[in-house]
Amino acid sequence: MTSAQNESQALGDLAARQLANATKTVPQLSTITPRWLLHLLNWVPVEAGIYRVNRVVNPEQVAIKAEAGAGSEEPLPQTYVDYETSPREYTLRSISTLVDIHTRVSDLYSSPHDQIAQQLRLTIETIKERQELELINSPEYGLLAQATPEQTIQTLAGAPTPDDLDALITKVWKTPSFFLTHPLGIAAFGREATYRGVPPPVVSLFGAQFITWRGIPLIPSDKVPVEDGKTKFILVRTGEERQGVVGLFQPGLVGEQAPGLSVRFTGINQSAIATYLVTLYTSLAVLTDDALAVLDDVAVDQFHEYK
């Protein structure tokens, strides 16, 4: 074989690629979730970062009289509605971080994607993931911490059955909004319902499909804890008007990017590194105890054999 035969007859791929522009995606962050809880909560703006929940004391003692019959002249009862003298106050909590970006990087490498914008986008997504985690698990204001012992029940046999969810509904029977649990919990309930011959219906919300029970959607969140093969089901009633659960945020922040979220440029240091402060102010309030209930110790590792 001659050297002429070894020579390329046309431009090769490797050399040609040096003149081609690759289409590049923005950075993909696998920890981003839909964060359905944030979408489903009603969000209330607060003043000075404080939200005070005033409750009635001894509501069963409010005296009301219904007329027994025509011509009754019995005296009417005297009553008043008393309030708590030390109501609970929720203080907004911050989730913050500093984002450092070298000015040389942002100057030279911001096409086609702006480096500063992408760094801030990914940071904000991570902060919002932490927000959902705190709204569920915070020992101060999380859903699980605010469920009272009277509103917490156990499963009948470990796995989440339709009977268990029915029992949970009796705790939040005044217009319940949604169940919240880990995806493994939803799968476990689907198995139990299907095994009993009552596969749960499906509803479309926000362009996604959710299974339901008694018309109430089961919302997944990987922030609901799973320990030793067990998780929890949370049933929530939302909204101020319904005396339910509400999310809290601070409006009118400097550098506001979203409700309760601000991004502020803090300066450039002597190493030419620019710094941005990203802060989210958030909390969650339960207006009445019966707005929230928890099904505890839900087994997610039980399976059935179908014959």
From Swiss-Prot:
| The protein, known as | Type 2A encapsulin shell protein
Q: Return the domain comment text from this UniProt entry.
A: Has 4 domains; an N-terminal arm not found in the type 1 subfamily, a discontinuous peripheral domain (P), an elongated loop (E) and the discontinuous axial domain (A).
Where would you say this protein principally sits, based on its record?
other
**Alphabetically ordered keywords of this record:** Cell membrane, Encapsulin nanocompartment, Membrane
Subunit field text:
The encapsulin nanocompartment is formed by 60 subunits; monomers form pentamers which assemble to form shells. There are 12 charged pores where the pentamers meet as well as 3-fold axis channels and dimer channels. Isolated from bacteria in a complex with cysteine desulfurase (AC Q9KII6).
Subcellular location, record wording: Encapsulin nanocompartment; Cell membrane
Q: What is the lineage of its organism?
A: Bacteria, Bacillati, Actinomycetota, Actinomycetes, Mycobacteriales
The answer to keyword Membrane applying to this record is yes
Q: Which cysteines are joined by disulfide bonds?
A: none
Concerning InterPro entries, the annotation shows:
Encap_f2a, SrpI-like
Q: Which GO terms describe its cellular component?
A: encapsulin nanocompartment; plasma membrane
User: Any extra detail in the entry?
Assistant: Detected in antisera from mice immunized with killed bacteria but not live bacteria. Cattle naturally infected with M.paratuberculosis all have antisera that recognize this protein.
Instruction: State the family named in the UniProt similarity comment for this chain.
Output: Belongs to the encapsulin family. Family 2A subfamily.
